């Protein structure tokens, strides 16, 4: 009887010890897993990927250079996509509060919709603030002086542009969003049309690249030109062909030249074949952008 009780007590004690060890081991395993996931670096969380836009864009070339010049980015990959696809990836990550790193620029509606920040760029790869500039074909001043006057005097602010971009992003047709802005900002528009005579159905072609900022500006300028009697055709092209179209006379002008960085190569190639009318927007910026909740403030933190 004594042996039987002793045996049962031993079995019970062994069972309790095994259960305790198993529970501790399971707890430690889960804890380690959580700790590992929680301590993943930003680089690991985004799988060493930067979400880019169209290949060939100035910001893509700058980012490729950043991957070369920043030692901590040696194992990173720049993912080519489009401005629309980049914005879609940003929105999906932001809604889940997941980290993401994108090639970004302002003005852009994403800064109005999301809490974002630029990563500091100690090496100055992305340069200082950019301007968006207007270019026209040679001879436009003589052929279509009223259009030339409007394009020469067109100038607005990042806030102006953002208002149009946000309306478009929220579902408005670009032409309708532009028409609304023109109607609501008649004083500013009158400054652009000052000295421009009305015309009777003359045709004019404006080239633009399919970035949200340029969709906004090109549609606004198009509406202003329509207001003084022009029949306006907007031609969507990639950045290089946009400059080429103006240089070759296939387009009369464009308000989409980002300088001195983004479109520098195209200006080098076509600059002597087009006429520059100066900045139509100041304070534009490009760089690597992350949601504000991402625990990194500099490219060197990645």
What does each of the following model-derived ranges do?
Residues 37-51, 137-139, 149, 155-158, ...:
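A conserved helix-loop-strand patch within extracytoplasmic ligand-binding domains
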Residues 16-20:
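C-terminal motif of bacterial Sec signal peptides marking the signal peptidase cleavage site
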Residues 107, 216-299:
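Short, glycine-/small- and polar/acidic-enriched structural segments
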Residues 49-53, 57-62, 145-191, 297-301:
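Ligand-binding clefts/hinges and TM-proximal coupling segments of bilobed small-molecule sensing domains
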Residues 22-25:
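Bacterial signal peptide processing site
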Residues 40-71, 77-87, 175, 201-228, ...:
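Bilobed "Venus flytrap"/periplasmic-binding protein-like clamshell domains
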Residues 97, 110-123, 264-277:
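Ligand-binding "clamshell"
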Residues 111-152, 279-287:
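Periplasmic-binding protein-like
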């Amino acid at each position: 009887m004594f042996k039987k009780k002793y045996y049962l007590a031993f079995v019970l004690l062994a069972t309790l010890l095994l259960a305790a060890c198993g529970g501790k081991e399971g707890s430690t395993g889960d804890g380690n897993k959580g700790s590992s996931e929680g301590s993943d670096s930003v680089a690991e969380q985004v799988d060493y990927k930067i979400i880019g836009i169209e290949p060939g864009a100035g910001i893509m070339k700058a980012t490729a250079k950043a991957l070369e010049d920043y030692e901590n980015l040696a194992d990173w990959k720049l993912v080519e996509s489009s401005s629309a696809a980049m914005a879609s990836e940003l929105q999906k990550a932001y809604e889940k509060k997941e980290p993401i790193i994108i090639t970004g620029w302002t003005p852009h509606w994403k800064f109005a919709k999301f809490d974002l920040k630029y990563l500091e760029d100690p090496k100055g790869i992305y340069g200082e603030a950019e301007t968006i500039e207007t270019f026209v074909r040679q001879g436009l001043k003589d052929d279509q002086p009223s259009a030339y006057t409007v394009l020469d005097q067109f100038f607005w602010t990042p806030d102006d542009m953002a208002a149009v971009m946000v309306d478009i992003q929220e579902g408005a047709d670009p032409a309708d969003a532009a028409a609304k802005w023109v109607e609501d900002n008649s004083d500013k528009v009158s400054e652009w049309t000052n000295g421009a005579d009305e015309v009777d159905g003359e045709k004019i072609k404006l080239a633009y690249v399919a970035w949200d900022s340029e969709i906004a500006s090109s549609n606004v300028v198009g509406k202003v030109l329509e207001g003084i009697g022009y029949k306006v055709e907007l031609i969507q092209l990639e950045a290089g062909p946009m400059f080429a179209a103006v240089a070759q006379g296939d387009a009369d002008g464009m308000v989409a030249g980002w300088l001195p960085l983004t479109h520098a190569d195209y200006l080098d190639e076509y600059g002597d074949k087009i006429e520059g009318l100066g900045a139509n927007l100041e304070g534009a910026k490009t760089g690597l952008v992350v949601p504000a909740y991402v625990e990194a403030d500099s490219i060197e933190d990645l």
